[in-house]
Amino acid sequence: MEGPPTAAHAAAPLRTAVFLALAASWQQPAVAVGNWNCARSTDDKQWECVAKRKDGGADTPAAPGPKAPPTALGEAALSQSNRAAPSTAVSPPTGAAPVAGTGLRPPPPVPSAASPSPSTMAGGPTEDEEDEESESAESEKAESTAAPQVAEGGSAGEPGGTPPARAPRPETPLAASRFVPSGTVSVRKEAASPQSVAAHAPGAPAGWTCKPQKESRSWDCNLVGPDPRGVARPVGAAGEPPEDWAQAATITEYDEQRFDRLLGMMPSNPWAGTCARGKRESDAAKDFLLTSKDRLARKRAPVEVHGNYGEMDDQEVATFTGDAEVTRYDQHVKGDFLSLNTEADTVNARGSVFYREKGLAFASDTAFMRMEEDKGVLRNSQFIVETMPSRGVARVAHMDSDTHSHYETATYTTCPPGNTDWMLHADEVTIDKETGRGDASHAWMEFKGVPIFYTPYMDFPVDDRRQSGFLSPTFGQSKVNGFNLSVPYYFNLAPDYDLTLQAREMTSRGPLFGGDFRWLTEHQRIRLLGEVIPEDSQTKTTRGQAGFDAMGRWTDSLFTLVDLNYVSDSKYLNQLNNTLGLVSNTFVQSQAYADYTYSNGSVRLLGDYYQNIDPSIPTEQTPYYRLPSLRGNYNEQIGDSGFRFQANAEVVNFGHGGNNVKGQRLNIRPQISYPIQSPGSFLVPSVALQNTTYMLQNQAAGTGSSLNRVAPIFSVDSGLVFDRDFELGSASLRQTLEPRVFYTYVPKINQNDYPIFDSNYYDFTYYQLFRTNRFAGADRLADMNQVTLGLTSRFIDRDTGWERLTASLGKVFFITDPSVTLVNPYGANPLGVVLGPDQGQFVYGNYNKSYANVIGKVDTRLTEAFFLGGEAQLSPYTGRFERGSVGLQYNDRQNNLMNLSYRYREPLPNQPAIEQAATIGQNTTALNNTDISFRIPFLKDWHVIGRWQYSLLYNRTLESLVGLEHETCCWRFTVLGREYLNGVNQSNAPTTNTAIFVQMELKGLTRLGDQVDRFLYRAINGYRMPNEDF
């Protein structure tokens, strides 16, 4: 083999970063012939040549020309859309047979002068590039006209002339691997829209493979993967029509292949977290917004270029091939071929193009970028929004600036690659990151391959910023309301306040109108909401509810709350809505208070009021309101003496709407204690003095308007802590044994003339055994001369710190029988329950007994997800459990839940026995209920949801709920049916209501109906809202 003539310019591989200050020429050994750069192959049997170029390529490489096939196609028949551009038969270079084992092939033919010009080919250049390409073409034409014929078999002056048939051997043997990436020979026409044909070794990038025919007069070419010219098509079977992906208005199979490759080039799969088990809702896509710091850093960042092969023309256009990449701050452009114009600051890329910036990633056939202006055009592009995550395709994507872009023939979804359960299609989509809005023209929704919605225009958010517009409608069906549809509209009035108006139509009741106003200030969060039915078609009355809520944090020490509520009637909350989140259907509380805290204590100023919404309850049994109430506490160590001083004080004005006794109460309780503590024991003796004074009105005859009560309170609290470490199987545990003794003495004081404004029994549990007063509030001070014995044992996992098992047992022993009762001399207690003369002696579960019930409590965490707990009170006199509860919960913190519980409570005296079937609505404190609730998975992506509350006391179901939910990482559908007790009629017979809830959510786009999540949050213990952390 003889070498070519003298070199015209040099070329060399580029394997390190190349900056904009690229040298005019590289002095690496190479040879050139006319319009070709040539180097010897490694086996020294052929030449490997690359055509010279002066331009940097174009946004859109040329499409195939007319459907004239090459002279021969070889064994595999190519579809018309996969054929190479028209060729002129030429003789291949001498000795250019394929080299066994290397995959190297000689250059293919170059189109003749009859080939279409770039400007007339499909996917031609954009207007911004036409001038540049025109100038490049004219200079090439002039150069080719003046060029002499340099070798036999070549075309003198022809830009795409073939390499020389034979050439003199260079004086020094050259290793081709130093100049051309192994396994690749590329030939590029020297026109503005280059065509690229290449042969590939196994594992090499896709492209054309060309072989000379036996007569060596023409070429047989075969396409592997996407066409490097930028109009790639998957190669189909013979006779199968090709997929017209370039005009497709959906996500095609070829797009899915591109998405797979795009994911492989990203640092991580953005759907990994969203599609993980338990992830309920996509995160807000706001991390793709450039901050001012990002913009400045991008402008100042240098441009870095990497590639396996590079070449510079006239110190202006740098060309790179072989895994080429351009980087500037967060922007990365990667492709098989890159050209960088240093004067125009433009980048052209083609062949497996990959572009990535903050929060966004693109794959495309071609990319034209103006780096300084943050502009670009990508054709046949696939994109991924990493922070949603979401993805889509656009046949043409225009990046107009760093905040604005628009897309032609676009498809969008939040489903991961390979899943197209739902897709949003549009002729054109515009995204404005600055405003957080997008719009689409001629948009239509497709779900499971079925079109379900069309609109000529739609406006949508692209991040979590608040925007005015319609919110997701809600709908449902119930027995008492009929079918109801609610349509809310949101007004983003200002950055610190907004308004939501709602229109709701119920076929059985008529229209309902509501509003919700929110205002956020520097120190306060204010909310005003209300609903009204102008005329309920069933009750023929105006019904509604209203609420005002204001929370303020004025300083680190001062906090305020105002919570005002109004409801028209007691049935409104069950029948229509409980927007206020109220827990009582009898009394509606409104309150306001201000808290001031400091290092040694706190002060609270409070006022409250109770609205009676149940007409069956007389006014006399309505709770007292406090207007105002001032309460404070103080706690401080007295120097180094070891003593601690505590004080509690309260002054309250109690009012009432009826003729009940009213008045003011002042209560002061100072206390001194001397705590002694060590790691294994504690001893806390203390003494307190409680002074209570009343100023009364409407008092009973013969009772003074001023009452005063003073009593000392002595107590000693002591305990020991023993522990031991041991192994149980593979678990390392620590067991503690904690005995506790608590003694209390309070002398007996006659309090029969004292009113009961706010006192009541504590909920009797294990921890109430260690209080110095068995009554809540200051109206009653219990006489106490008793000892409480308690024992607690814990099993602690030493590796995790979890309490695997905690068991406690306690009992009160009376030294002197208690006698102070909760009898109200004025006929009613704050809960509206009239107490008879033999009631009120409710002492730790017993009446006029010398011994209280034995209380036991057990909590165990079987695993991280399983929890079992229970508590019971056993009467030593009757041998009956007078009170008890047990519950088993499974919660894997992924909203897979199951709750099993049972509650039992004996009635108060003079109430029906627990064994008797009481009538619903009768005043009784007895309970005998079971409660089962769950949300458990079955099959793939399916959950069954349910709840069943059953009263063994009334022998009937209190509430039943059943539903199904299908959830994937991009959509969720839920349907629920519910039946529940709605109250009682005039004859005390129970009434029920049934309702159906339906919710459809396309994650990251929209939701139809939002009542299901809010209802399940209240109905199933442990359930979390989609946007709530576990």
UniProtKB/Swiss-Prot annotation:
Signal sequence extent: 1-32
InterPro entries assigned to the protein according to its UniProt record, in alphabetical order: LipoPS_assembly_LptD (IPR020889), LptD (IPR050218), LptD_2 (IPR045659), LptD_C (IPR007543)
Keyword Membrane part of the UniProt annotation: yes
Native species: Methylococcus capsulatus (strain ATCC 33009 / NCIMB 11132 / Bath)
Function field: Together with LptE, is involved in the assembly of lipopolysaccharide (LPS) at the surface of the outer membrane.
One Pfam family hit: LptD
Start-end of Acidic residues biased regions: 126-137
Protein name: LPS-assembly protein LptD
Top-rank lineage group of the source organism: Bacteria
Family: Belongs to the LptD family.
HAMAP family in the record: LPS_assembly_LptD
Polar residues compositional bias, start-end: 78-91
Gene (name only): lptD
Keywords: Cell outer membrane, Membrane, Signal
Compartment list: Cell outer membrane
Chain intervals for the UniProt region annotation (Disordered): 50-213
GO cellular component terms listed in the entry, alphabetical order: cell outer membrane; transporter complex
Record's compositionally biased regions (Pro residues): 161-171
Subunit comment: Component of the lipopolysaccharide transport and assembly complex. Interacts with LptE and LptA.
Residues passing through the membrane, by range: none
GO biological process: Gram-negative-bacterium-type cell outer membrane assembly; lipopolysaccharide transport
